[in-house]
Amino acid sequence: AINRQINLELYASYVYLSMSYYFDRDDVALKNFAKYFLHQSHEEREHAEKLMKLQNQRGGRIFLQDIKKPEYDDWESGLNAMECALHLEKSVNQSLLELHKLATDKNDPHLCDFIETHYLNEQVKSIKELGDHVTNLRKMGAPESGMAEYLFDKHTLGHSDNES
């Protein structure tokens, strides 16, 4: 079950990496979307590595699986990418909740504590942040208005560095 979660975290990292380099393209040129998704990619990879470290500490074995290709090569718009990211984070969250339930059923308080400490709050924050981004992009008229995504890139994502 932990190996399955490792694969899902690596898949999420791979999807975010794909998004990042899509927005970095010269014909898309939304550098703060690119930076935002690259940061998300690194976070997801760190989540996978934390689980791998846990697996080794507990004497388990890591069995890496193939990482599925992202659903899209062309993410179309900032809004579409944010909606896909929101869906992805909800899937990761659901998988973590199922892993937590399994740990509870198998009487594994250590794994429960690990998931609660390192993952669940962060997932809720990510889902809220992405939900806010989707809402604000829609309010601004994205994706029909290219100006909306440009301004969101510049003023919302461009300032998120200063806040975190």
UniProtKB/Swiss-Prot annotation:
Subcellular location: Cytoplasm; Lysosome; Cytoplasmic vesicle, Autophagosome
Domain Ferritin-like diiron: 1-141
Record's keyword annotation contains Protease: no
UniProt keyword annotations, A-Z: Cytoplasm, Cytoplasmic vesicle, Iron, Iron storage, Lysosome, Metal-binding, Oxidoreductase, Phosphoprotein
Reaction(s) catalysed by this chain's protein: 4 Fe(2+) + O2 + 4 H(+) = 4 Fe(3+) + 2 H2O
Modified residues (Phosphoserine): S160, S164
Residue sites binding Fe cation 1 per the record: E9, E44, H47
One CC-aspect GO term: lysosome
Positions of transmembrane segments: none
One GO MF term: ferroxidase activity
Main location: cytoplasm
Residues annotated as binding Fe cation 2: E44, E89, Q123
Assembly description: Oligomer of 24 subunits. There are two types of subunits: L (light) chain and H (heavy) chain. The major chain can be light or heavy, depending on the species and tissue type. The functional molecule forms a roughly spherical shell with a diameter of 12 nm and contains a central cavity into which the insoluble mineral iron core is deposited. Interacts with NCOA4; NCOA4 promotes targeting of the iron-binding ferritin complex to autolysosomes following starvation or iron depletion.
Family statement drawn from the similarity comment of this UniProt entry: Belongs to the ferritin family.
Function: Stores iron in a soluble, non-toxic, readily available form. Important for iron homeostasis. Has ferroxidase activity. Iron is taken up in the ferrous form and deposited as ferric hydroxides after oxidation. Also plays a role in delivery of iron to cells. Mediates iron uptake in capsule cells of the developing kidney. Delivery to lysosomes is mediated by the cargo receptor NCOA4 for autophagic degradation and release of iron.
Name listed for the protein in its UniProt record: Ferritin heavy chain
